[in-house]
């Protein structure tokens, strides 16, 4: 069979630990035999990030902006223990955070659903995608402990010399104070990414804040979303028959639980942090969650939503058998190749992405799975295999599908 040709390179970001092992297995077994892979490779493994003073992370993000589509392996964000383990000379920042900042992107996470794994919420029939605004709010806040009676004030000093001041609270004893912010530019970028992704995936978009209580802060989010929708996307949404819907965050939670799924739920930073974990667990497994970073100007970076699977990696180093779930990493590859094919007008590459995912579903529907999924599967006689066995089973079914 002739390999599928590519015209534009895919930006490939390698990673760490067990996911790095899976990365090579997936490439060798499921990509390279079928695709004449054209990629620009960046090693984001922690040792090389340390060696390059993290310049490789910056370079990879700039390449993603240049070429438009990237696929990323899970990476370690170092802490004190990792600094010692890897003999690092600095505690480097999260690669995802660096890439997200450079691409000015929004993270969209969605579950991979199969008939034999039922969501905890019985009426969910389709995946629910979480769009999390990954800038500001409590994550960029400053905090102060007040240890005596006094007055806390919010002060803004404009460059023009104009000064605004408002009392937060008059303390008659000890307490805590927090100040947080966001920017119109960041909120607007978030809105554009959400509307574009909704059009791209032909799904309704929900957005929720608490603007009845937060009449300036949250209200600005709502206002900007409405402005962006009315000026840039309303007509296209109508053409596609999809809807933009705003509601309060508490009402949104109730509606999500009652829904059948099949939409994008845009959330502020904290709400998205919490709700993405709730959704991944309710749908079955974090190992079955896809993640794509989308910039406002339509650049894409695909990855798995999970980490580097450290525990399995240590067992792998000891020569022990591991049954690590590669599904989310495979779907990162399939999503990136499909998008590359779509942008370059290569139908065969788009179809390959579809067929690769279908081969994964065929394998699971035949009861062949990694250990983490076996206990979750119902209505099928499931057999646990190791990572290599699972990938081999997918390849066998992929070859059948490709003829």
Feature roles, as predicted:
Residues 2-8, 18, 22-23, 28-53, ...:
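N-terminal alpha-helical transmembrane segments of multi-pass membrane transport
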Residues 318-324, 342-403:
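Internal helix-turn-beta structural module
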Residues 49-62, 233-262:
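A structured beta-alpha segment of the ubiquitous adenosine-cofactor-binding alpha/beta core
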Residues 6-25, 29, 154-247:
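Glycine-rich phosphate/diphosphate-binding loop of Rossmann-like nucleotide-binding domains
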Residues 35-41, 201-209, 233-246, 341-353, ...:
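Flexible, glycine/charged-enriched surface loops at secondary-structure junctions
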Residues 47-159, 163, 270-274:
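N-terminal glycine-rich phosphate/adenylate-binding segment common to multiple enzyme folds
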Residues 256-355, 362-366:
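Glycine-rich phosphate/nucleotide-binding loop
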């Amino acid at each position: 069979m002739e390999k599928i040709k590519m015209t534009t390179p895919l930006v490939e970001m390698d990673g760490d630990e067990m996911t790095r092992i899976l990365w090579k297995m997936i490439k060798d077994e499921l990509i390279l035999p079928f695709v004449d892979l054209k990629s620009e490779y960046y090693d984001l493994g922690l040792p090389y990030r340390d060696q390059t003073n993290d310049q490789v992370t910056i370079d990879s993000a700039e390449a993603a902006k240049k070429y438009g589509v990237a696929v990323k392996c899970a990476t370690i964000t170092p802490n004190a223990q990792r600094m010692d383990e890897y003999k690092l000379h600095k505690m480097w920042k999260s690669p995802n955070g660096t890439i997200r900042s450079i691409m000015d992107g929004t993270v969209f996470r969605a579950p991979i659903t199969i008939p034999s794994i039922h969501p905890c919420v019985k009426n969910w029939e389709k995946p629910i995608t979480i769009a999390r605004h990954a800038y500001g709010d409590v994550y960029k806040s400053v905090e102060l402990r007040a240890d005596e009676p006094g007055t806390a004030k919010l002060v803004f000093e404009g460059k023009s010399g104009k000064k605004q001041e408002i009392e937060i609270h008059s303390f008659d004893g000890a307490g805590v104070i927090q100040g947080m912010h966001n920017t119109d530019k960041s909120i607007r970028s978030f809105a554009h990414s959400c509307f574009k992704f909704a059009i791209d995936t032909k799904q309704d978009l929900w957005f929720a804040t608490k603007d009845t209580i937060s009449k300036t802060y949250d209200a600005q989010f709502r206002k900007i979303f409405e402005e962006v929708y009315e000026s840039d996307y309303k007509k296209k949404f109508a053409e596609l028959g999809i809807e933009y819907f705003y509601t309060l965050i508490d009402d949104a939670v109730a509606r999500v639980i009652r829904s059948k799924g099949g939409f994008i739920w845009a959330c502020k930073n904290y709400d998205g942090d919490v709700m993405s974990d709730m959704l991944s667990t309710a749908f079955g497994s974090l190992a079955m969650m896809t993640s794509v970073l989308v910039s406002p100007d339509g650049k894409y970076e695909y990855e798995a939503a999970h980490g580097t699977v450290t525990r399995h990696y240590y067992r792998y180093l000891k020569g022990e058998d591991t049954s690590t779930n590669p599904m989310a990493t495979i779907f990162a590859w399939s999503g990136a190749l499909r998008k590359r094919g779509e942008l370059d007008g290569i139908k065969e590459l788009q179809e390959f992405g579809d067929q690769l995912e279908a081969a994964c579903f065929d394998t699971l529907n035949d009861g062949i799975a990694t250990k983490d999924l076996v206990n979750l599967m119902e209505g099928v006689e499931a057999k646990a295999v190791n990572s290599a066995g699972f990938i081999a089973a997918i390849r066998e079914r992929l070859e059948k599908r490709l003829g």
